[in-house]
């Protein structure tokens, strides 16, 4: 197919000026074209993040999902707002993809926001929000992670159980003791 050959030629040439044209493929109503665009952008050696984020806002659901997956794959922390927007306004399928992508686009600066979202998340959103909090904390030293999570647990009141998985992910014995104690008192 000519479109496929042309697309892969652009990828092989690798000129970053082709990125917006490749990102346009995500806006197609043809799922095969969207998948071609996703594969091409995933293989492209340059910085695709800005063009992909721009395409997500006006793409159909398949293109939004493909774009979110690309942003996650590229760890596009600068484009976290694109992912957060889709959590707010996307269709159920797009929201699910945005929640999955979230853990890959968060950084240390997003800890407070991610904790707030975890504490207000509905039941289906809790697991991906916990993964996002764990990811946001990951650049901190372990002792700081434990301290930050323990502080958030105190602030969360009766929603402190939401942080058990996050606290356990630190692997610290005192953190694990807190989790065990919490389970015992809540069961």
Show the residue positions of the predicted features.
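HEAT/HEAT-like alpha-solenoid repeats
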Residues: 18, 114-115, 145-149
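Conserved functional loop/turn residues at catalytic and ligand-binding sites
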Residues: 17, 187
């Amino acid at each position: 197919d000519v479109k496929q050959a042309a697309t892969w030629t652009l990828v092989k040439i690798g000129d970053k000026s082709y990125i917006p044209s490749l990102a346009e493929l995500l806006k197609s109503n043809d799922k095969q074209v969207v998948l071609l665009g996703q594969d091409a952008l995933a293989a492209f050696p340059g910085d695709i993040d800005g063009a992909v984020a721009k395409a997500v806002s006006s793409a159909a659901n398949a293109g939004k999902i493909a774009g979110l997956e690309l942003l996650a794959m590229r760890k596009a922390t600068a484009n976290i707002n694109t992912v957060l927007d889709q959590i707010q306004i996307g269709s159920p399928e797009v929201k699910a993809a945005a929640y999955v992508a979230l853990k890959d686009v968060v950084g240390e600066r997003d800890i407070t926001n991610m904790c707030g979202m975890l504490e207000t998340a509905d039941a289906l959103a809790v697991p991906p929000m916990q993964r996002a909090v764990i990811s946001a904390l990951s650049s901190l030293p372990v002792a700081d992670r434990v301290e930050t999570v323990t502080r958030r647990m105190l602030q969360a009141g009766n929603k402190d159980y939401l942080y058990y998985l996050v606290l356990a992910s630190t692997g610290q014995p005192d953190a694990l003791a807190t989790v065990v104690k919490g389970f015992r008192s809540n069961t």
